[in-house]
């Protein structure tokens, strides 16, 4: 029953946030959804970096894919006889792309992958870049579909689930990570009810996740972030399913701010907690969450909703974008390599140590 053949991808996988046209990267502008469906055209690597920083494109896998195409765009501005010479000239552009969002490891991973293939490329280095960028996108989509099947298999039929932020097609090459599990679970009739937290301050849950599910014909119920513990106490959800921006060697997981408190509440109420992310999100070089740089964004993002100020002048705000959930609060980490139950350093090493 967990076979991906049971999933109608024509229904559950038709949204695409990135489109490479051959001469530019078209990004579905996620700052304007759900009311305006508009694309941002990026024809330089710096335009891609700005789109990543400004959240026109967001989600750890999606920004890694965007960065790959950003390298392809940067390559147009230089001349080099081989990949190694090109890499030296491209390094400033790669550094600017990497600085756009510091917490998500997929961004650095994608750029390191581009460096590796460039360093070994000959005179055809431009074609090598384009092939590698496309491969990053193709592999992400395949991984998401596989993770969807693996994660759905953990869910008992009739379950309710709660998700946080946006981890669907908009955050990936397609189908999604945590939302991919939910899509697969709905397709297999394992999930009876979906709840989504609004995810302040950017409202990714309210603006993006419930919109995505609506496009698929999936009935989702939006809740205020502050209602999550009460929802768990009610018995309406059996799983919290989230994505990740970085998973450490001991299972500690950085994800959208608010994830940590969901994990604490889930453990208290006997609700299972699942993290879904491709292996590119796993950072075995980072021993624990204490070593993760947590991105801080403009405090002004907390001062209003939808462009309307709701806070008095002169108020200070603290606006971390991510938090770290300890591995011992996570029941399962799902990647395309398999399921790591009760993740700890030994289990993570066994799965990803090579």
Curated annotation (Swiss-Prot):
Annotated pathway: Amino-acid biosynthesis; L-methionine biosynthesis via salvage pathway; L-methionine from S-methyl-5-thio-alpha-D-ribose 1-phosphate: step 1/6
Site (Transition state stabilizer): 165
Annotated Gene3D superfamilies: translation initiation factor eif-2b, domain 1, Translation initiation factor eif-2b, domain 2
The entry's keywords: Amino-acid biosynthesis, Isomerase, Methionine biosynthesis
Binding residues annotated for substrate, in chain numbering: 58-60, 101, 204, 255-256
GO MF assignments: S-methyl-5-thioribose-1-phosphate isomerase activity
Record has Repeat as a keyword: no
Lineage, uppermost ranks: Bacteria, Pseudomonadati, Pseudomonadota, Gammaproteobacteria, Lysobacterales
Pfam families: IF-2B
Disulfide bonds, paired cysteine numbers: none
Active site: 245 (proton donor)
Name assigned to this protein: Methylthioribose-1-phosphate isomerase
Family: Belongs to the eIF-2B alpha/beta/delta subunits family. MtnA subfamily.
Keyword Iron-sulfur recorded: no
EC number(s) per entry: 5.3.1.23
Function: Catalyzes the interconversion of methylthioribose-1-phosphate (MTR-1-P) into methylthioribulose-1-phosphate (MTRu-1-P).
Catalytic activity from the UniProt record: 5-(methylsulfanyl)-alpha-D-ribose 1-phosphate = 5-(methylsulfanyl)-D-ribulose 1-phosphate
NCBIfam families (alphabetical): eIF-2B_rel, PRK05720.1, salvage_mtnA
